[in-house]
């Protein structure tokens, strides 16, 4: 069992397979030009899998593949199958923008992927294009349909932004409700790489938009999930709100992050990290596990997105998967 320095059980590993992305979302990507990490600097799937096996043996029960955009990584389905074959009952999920899903959803399901979180910030082509800096909506909607047809469990993530997509909060929720998908509204997380003119909506503002049409009931958090759940009184539809600015957001954090270059990151907000790359490539898995435990021992108690401070993180979310 893996325990962090504050006594929290850690059983959830998030793996960023690449920092590259085929979108340039305003709340994630920098305005100024930047260079990707060379592909040869990334851990290959064989070395990644060595660490994944060790992490599972130490108590990891849930793995989420992220990016950047994970579907850009070649042989993604083969890596998923490697994990599934080693531990068929592992909770294996992926976060994606959905743009490439139409042609690969069936393969991912067959390989052993169980769940998907797909970003959908607007149902208006022009607004989706503004946010992603690319005409994306048609492909994303087709990807969602393909994932559902493949039998994957799908949740939708939406980041409400003032003056951009705040008028679509209910529309996107109803789109999800009609298709049996849970939507999770994610508060915009301030970071130095996002466009400087963005203003996110706080949880209360998001709920107020929904209350203009629906009566809602609080459910609460389930397990270690960061989402606070609510229910529509009308039909029992459940949606989530991820609010990192709340003081209790970090109390049940059970996750550790691994970047595509092999850095273990204890918290999305903080820059501190340790690399397992050399240890894994040398076949010294015991050393990699030691590094994992050291990082967990230094895991902070909470982030700094407090309701009062609203500090901006230096961490690039396209490196760590958000």
From Swiss-Prot:
Residues 5-227 form the Radical SAM core domain. SUPFAM superfamilies: Radical SAM enzymes. [4Fe-4S] cluster 2 binds at residues 250, 253, 267. Pathway: Cofactor biosynthesis; molybdopterin biosynthesis. One of its GO terms (molecular function) is metal ion binding. The keyword Methyltransferase does not apply. One of its GO terms (biological process) is Mo-molybdopterin cofactor biosynthetic process. InterPro entries: Aldolase_TIM (IPR013785), Elp3/MiaA/NifB-like_rSAM (IPR006638), MoaA (IPR013483), MoaA_NifB_PqqE_Fe-S-bd_CS (IPR000385), MoaA_twitch (IPR010505), MoCo_biosynth_MoaA/MoaC (IPR050105), rSAM (IPR007197). Belongs to the radical SAM superfamily. MoaA family. HAMAP family: MoaA_B. This is GTP 3',8-cyclase. The gene is moaA.
């Amino acid at each position: 069992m893996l325990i962090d320095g504050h006594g929290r059980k850690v059983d959830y590993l998030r793996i960023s397979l690449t920092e590259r992305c085929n979108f340039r979302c305003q709340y994630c990507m920098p305005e100024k030009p930047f260079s990707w990490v060379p592909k040869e600097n990334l851990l290959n799937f064989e070395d990644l899998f060595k660490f994944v096996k060790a992490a599972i043996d130490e108590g990891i029960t849930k793995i989420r593949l992220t990016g950047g955009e994970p579907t850009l990584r070649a042989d993604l389905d083969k890596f998923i199958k490697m994990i599934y074959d080693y531990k068929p009952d592992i909770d294996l999920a992926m976060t994606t923008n959905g743009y490439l899903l139409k042609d690969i959803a069936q393969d991912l399901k067959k390989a052993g992927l169980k769940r998907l979180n797909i970003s959908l910030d607007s149902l208006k082509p022009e607004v989706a294009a503004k946010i992603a800096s690319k005409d994306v909506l048609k492909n994303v909607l087709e990807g969602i349909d393909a994932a559902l047809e493949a039998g994957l469990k799908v949740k939708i993530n939406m980041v409400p932004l003032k003056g951009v997509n705040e008028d679509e909060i209910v529309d996107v929720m109803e789109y999800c409700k009609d298709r049996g998908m849970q939507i999770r509204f994610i508060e915009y997380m301030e970071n130095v790489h996002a466009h400087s003119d963005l203003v996110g909506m706080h949880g209360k503002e998001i709920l107020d938009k929904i209350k203009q049409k629906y009566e809602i009931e609080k459910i609460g958090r389930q397990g270690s999930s960061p989402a606070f759940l609510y229910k529509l009184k009308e039909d029992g539809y459940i949606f989530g709100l991820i609010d990192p600015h709340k003081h209790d957001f970090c109390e049940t954090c059970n996750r550790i992050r691994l970047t595509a270059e092999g850095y273990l990151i204890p918290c999305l907000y903080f820059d501190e990290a340790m690399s397992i790359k050399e240890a894994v490539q040398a076949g010294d898995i015991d050393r990699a596990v030691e590094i994992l435990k050291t990082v967990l021992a230094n895991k902070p108690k909470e982030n700094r997105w407090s309701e009062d401070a609203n500090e901006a993180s230096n961490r690039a979310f396209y490196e760590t998967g958000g």
